[in-house]
Swiss-Prot record:
E.C. number(s) listed in UniProt: 4.1.1.39
Prodomain residues: 1-2
Protein name: Ribulose bisphosphate carboxylase large chain
Native organism taxonomy: Eukaryota, Viridiplantae, Streptophyta, Embryophyta, Tracheophyta
Active site: K175 (proton acceptor), H294 (proton acceptor)
Sites where the protein binds substrate: N123, T173, K177, R295, H327, S379
Annotated organism of origin: Nicotiana acuminata
GO cellular component: chloroplast
Keyword terms of this UniProt record: Acetylation, Calvin cycle, Carbon dioxide fixation, Chloroplast, Disulfide bond, Lyase, Magnesium, Metal-binding, Methylation, Monooxygenase, Oxidoreductase, Photorespiration, Photosynthesis, Plastid
Entry-linked Gene3D superfamilies: Ribulose bisphosphate carboxylase, large subunit, C-terminal domain (3.20.20.110), RuBisCO large subunit, N-terminal domain (3.30.70.150)
Family: Belongs to the RuBisCO large chain family. Type I subfamily.
Record's subunit section: Heterohexadecamer of 8 large chains and 8 small chains; disulfide-linked. The disulfide link is formed within the large subunit homodimers.
Site positions per UniProt: Transition state stabilizer: K334
Single GO biological process annotation from the record: photorespiration
Catalytic activity, reaction form: 2 (2R)-3-phosphoglycerate + 2 H(+) = D-ribulose 1,5-bisphosphate + CO2 + H2O; D-ribulose 1,5-bisphosphate + O2 = 2-phosphoglycolate + (2R)-3-phosphoglycerate + 2 H(+)
């Protein structure tokens, strides 16, 4: 036996594989105020006990690996390891469990959503011992929240910038989303803003294509904004999509938007990435730009109930990374979104403090301390008949965004904007008078039609358009 071998043997290191639950399943653990807490929906492979599955998640998303390593002795695993501290069976689902995991704060870089997600939703999602794994919720402790800038400005600052209070903001995505020249695109922006909308928007896949380069679009949209502001006396905006192939190009586009004096830019935060998004959010705060966030790609991640990441987690991550608006679904439109679930993460976007409420899918109490709030954006398959429900569901601190529901008006873009603005003001007035929007919504819209031929025409076009499909992602019974 060589001297080296004798030395290793004398250390007493015992190589091999041991069950994760021996180290990482700790039901006696008392969580700390500084821990990041996670709720995972775990579906183990046949024959894998839930305790072992939960412990494997804790291990593989923190300090563990598939075998014992001698370098474990060079650090304090008890200080740094994740711990599965509770497991609940999911009622009504076969072989599904909610595993609660606590992570010490020292595992994560300050102010980095990228680093947090790399650990918590990293390689563990491909672990063979699990048939499926979904991150349902995270509790971000105040100590970690305070390391983030968050939204560039927040809800109150945005209202002050726009000088608009007491109602939801009104927007429109320019359609067709691809193919228009920059000049025709700017014309549509002008017509919608002149008709009464607060914002118009680039679609998420409008970047800088051969038919419309970004600089041309920015120039024509800025001209449209200033012309509409002059004619209406209201502050207007267009979400100029700064998303690009590199962070440097993205910031270059944001700089040009600032030089034009426009109020807001836009980013696709999931396809663009959290590092790029946080960089843009910091630039926007430093330079007085509002930041609209689109969630393109989210349904690839969040739609399936047993695997992926729930949107409430992606919403929390966005509030930390930074954005003043984010698309949140509509409940009543063409996109996925159950009412209770949607209102749960809408509160997580807007409110300073949100209590645990499993009836809305909120697994943990969340204290955002002083982090500014984010306006939810209801967009996707909505029209004037939806206005009472949208106003009742989302309240004043929201953006209601009608793309086809504006540009599909039979008389053109400006009349479509007029119809939406009048429908919104009728609903806000009725609500302020004490009327029940949920029960009297259709009647309120019909009454308003008497004063607006534009609204009457819109109501006639979309009177039979509904999207009656059951939601895929629903609350557990």
């Amino acid at each position: 036996m060589s001297p080296q071998t004798e030395t290793k043997a004398s250390v007493g290191f015992k190589a091999g594989v041991k069950e994760y639950k021996l180290t990482y399943y700790t039901p006696e653990y008392q969580t700390k105020d500084t821990d990041i807490l996670a709720a995972f929906r775990v579906t183990p492979q046949p024959g894998v006990p839930p305790e072992e599955a939960g412990a494997a998640v804790a291990a593989e998303s923190s300090t563990g690996t598939w075998t014992t390593v001698w370098t474990d002795g060079l650090t304090s695993l008890d200080r740094y390891k994740g711990r599965c501290y509770r497991i609940e069976r999911v009622v009504g689902e076969k072989d599904q469990y909610i595993a609660y995991v606590a992570y010490p704060l020292d595992l994560f870089e300050e102010g980095s959503v990228t680093n947090m997600f790399t650990s918590i939703v990293g390689n563990v999602f491909g672990f063979k011992a699990l048939r499926a794994l979904r991150l349902e919720d995270l509790r971000i402790p105040p100590a970690y929240v305070k390391t983030f800038q968050g939204p560039p400005h927040g809800i109150q600052v945005e209202r002050d910038k726009l000088n608009k209070y007491g109602r939801p903001l009104l927007g429109c995505t320019i359609k067709p989303k691809l193919g228009l020249s920059a000049k025709n695109y700017g014309r549509a922006v002008y017509e919608c803003l002149r008709g009464g909308l607060d914002f118009t928007k680039d679609d998420e896949n409008v970047n800088s294509q051969p038919f419309m380069r970004w600089r041309d679009r920015f120039l024509f949209c800025a001209e449209a904004i200033y012309k509409a502001q002059t004619e209406t006396g209201e502050i207007k905006g267009h979400y100029l999509n700064a998303t690009a192939g590199t962070c440097e190009e993205m910031i270059k586009r944001a700089v040009f938007a600032r030089e034009l004096g426009v109020p807001i830019v836009m980013h696709d935060y999931l396809t663009g990435g959290f590092t790029a998004n946080t960089s843009l959010a910091h630039y926007c705060r430093d330079n007085g730009l509002l930041l609209h966030i689109h969630r393109a790609m989210h349904a690839v991640i969040d739609r399936q109930k047993n695997h992926g990441i729930h949107f409430r987690v992606l919403a929390k991550a966005l509030r930390m990374s930074g954005g003043d608006h984010i698309h949140s679904g509509t409940v009543v439109g063409k996109l996925e979104g159950e009412r209770d679930i949607t209102l749960g993460f809408v509160d997580l976007l807007r409110d300073d403090f949100v209590e645990q409420d499993r009836s809305r899918g909120i697994y943990f109490t969340q204290d955002w301390v002083s982090l500014p709030g984010v306006l939810p954006v209801a967009s996707g398959g909505i029209h004037v008949w939806h206005m009472p429900a949208l106003t009742e569901i989302f309240g004043d601190d929201s953006v209601l965004q009608f793309g086809g529901g504006t540009l599909g008006h039979p008389w053109g873009n400006a009349p479509g904007a007029v119809a939406n603005r009048l429908a919104l003001e009728a609903c806000v007035q009725a609500r302020n008078e004490g009327r029940d929007l949920a029960q009297e919504g259709n009647e309120i819209i019909r009454e308003a039609c008497k004063w607006s031929p534009e609204l009457a025409a819109a109501c006639q076009v979309w009177k039979e358009i509904v999207f009656n499909f059951a939601a895929v992602d629903v609350l557990d019974k």
